Swiss-Prot record:
Protein name: Zinc-regulated transporter 2
PANTHER family per the UniProt record, alphabetical: ZINC-REGULATED TRANSPORTER 2, ZINC/IRON TRANSPORTER
UniProt family annotation: Belongs to the ZIP transporter (TC 2.A.5) family.
Keywords for this protein: Ion transport, Membrane, Phosphoprotein, Transmembrane, Transmembrane helix, Transport, Zinc, Zinc transport
């Protein structure tokens, strides 16, 4: 390792001082302004998704979600990978840093290591849940016996079967009712409630039915696109058919598997963003003449990053035992940059961003973070959301998808523009 970072000569030409030029009061103010902007960005989606008095229309959350996705993708390339390349490519480092583009190499290693981690995690999650892909009988009907009103799913070649539309399956030890994703399915009464029966029967209108087993989703507002039946999601084989006797168990297993994979993606996303936020704060605290411009830009930078992270945290269907996690994750992001600014002010005479150690540390961590956010952005936020999600299905699916795409482009463009100054 010493050989890797050693120079060919004994003269250190890296900076020996930082650009700190006073303005201590303004720098202290920056701690609180960055705190507010970070908190506003990350907590607004979380609060609006949980409290009705500030709950926004669905289209507002839709915009925030995909705008934030664009912000994260642009952050990976413009605010992480490029600065990492500049830091590790600085002429004062010399040695192996002058012979190989280490920023891109570390980014690539980080990306592949993250992919390997997700492969192993997904395997053990599926194994733990007893998830296999054997042959199963095709579902033609579902029968749920419950004391509330229901409707009949009628197979044209078989007798109608009663299904209770308030039957609760456990998704994460929470009782969450399931409904159909296809809003065009209409249930109409076919007969009056029979004496002694506690179920009202309904018949789905002809021409508007699909296999209900492939349409069950949780009605919780925080579980959009989280739960789906095997064969219809990003993590399971296409067109799997489930045996009726195993359907409820398989739904629970797939829900848990989807949940655990989504949780992993959210934690990875936060990890990459927090890494970056540390050096953002340190750089701001000792900036010289560019401090005022950098201060303004980083205020919006943190707000937009928080928005991207907050929407992903908010849409995760946390179990009752983990309801505090969104608040903790938001708090971690909110505090990271302000604390880094405060620490930087405290060590302003010893922290030199252009020094050899600082360049290497900053470049390595930015490279790692860029690999994390590039993988998360391209795989989870783009490919998974646009190609494998059920939210763009239906007659207006293409219109919604193109709208989401344009919104994401706007988020990426704005964040890329901020890269001109920070």
């Amino acid at each position: 390792m010493v050989d890797l970072i050693a120079r060919d000569d004994s003269v250190d030409t890296c900076q020996a001082s930082n650009g700190y030029n006073g303005h201590a009061g303004l720098r202290i103010l920056a701690v609180f302004i960055i705190l507010i902007s970070s908190g506003l960005g990350v907590y607004f989606p979380i609060l609006s998704s949980r409290y009705s008095f500030i709950r926004l229309p669905n289209w507002c959350f839709f915009i925030a979600k995909f705008f934030g996705s664009g912000v994260i993708v642009a952050t990976a390339f413009v605010h992480l990978l490029q600065p990492a390349a500049e830091a590790l490519g600085d002429e004062c480092l010399g040695g192996t840093f002058a012979e190989y583009p280490w920023a891109f190499g570390i980014c690539l290693m980080s990306l592949f290591l993250l992919f390997f981690t997700e492969i192993i995690t997904h395997y053990f999650v599926a194994k733990t849940l007893g998830h296999d892909h054997g042959d199963h009988g095709e579902v033609t009907s579902i029968d749920v016996d419950a004391p509330s009103s229901g409707f009949v799913i009628r197979n044209m070649d078989s007798d109608p079967v009663s299904f209770n539309n308030e039957a609760a399956y456990s998704i994460h030890n929470d009782k969450t009712p399931y409904t159909t994703r296809n809003e065009e399915i209409v249930a109409t009464p076919i007969k009056e409630k029979e004496p002694g029966s506690n179920v009202t029967n309904y018949d789905l209108e002809p021409g508007k039915t699909e296999s209900l087993a492939n349409e069950l989703v949780p009605t919780s507002s925080h579980a959009t696109n989280l739960a789906s039946v095997p064969g219809k999601d990003h993590y399971s084989h296409e067109n799997d058919h489930q045996d009726v006797s195993q359907l409820a168990t398989r739904i629970e297993e797939e829900d848990k598997e989807q949940y655990l994979n989504q949780i992993l993606a959210v934690f990875i996303l936060e990890f990459g963003i927090i890494f970056h936020s540390v050096f953002v704060g340190l750089s701001l605290s000792v900036a010289g003449e560019e401090f005022e411009t950098l201060f303004i830009v980083l205020t919006f930078h943190q707000m937009f990053e928080g928005l991207g992270l907050g929407t992903r945290v908010a849409e995760t269907n946390w179990p009752e035992s983990k309801k505090y996690m969104p608040w903790l994750m938001g708090l971690a992001f909110t505090l990271t940059s302000p604390i880094a600014v405060a620490v930087g002010i405290g060590v302003r005479h010893s922290w030199i961003p252009g020094s050899r150690r600082a360049l290497i540390a900053n470049g390595v961590f930015d490279s790692i973070s860029s690999g994390i956010l590039i993988y998360t952005g391209l795989v989870e936020l783009m490919a998974h959301e646009f190609l494998y999600s059920n939210q763009f299905k239906g007659p207006d699916g293409l219109k919604k998808m193109l709208s989401a795409y344009l919104i994401m482009c706007c988020g990426a463009a704005l964040m890329a523009l901020l890269g001109k100054w920070a």
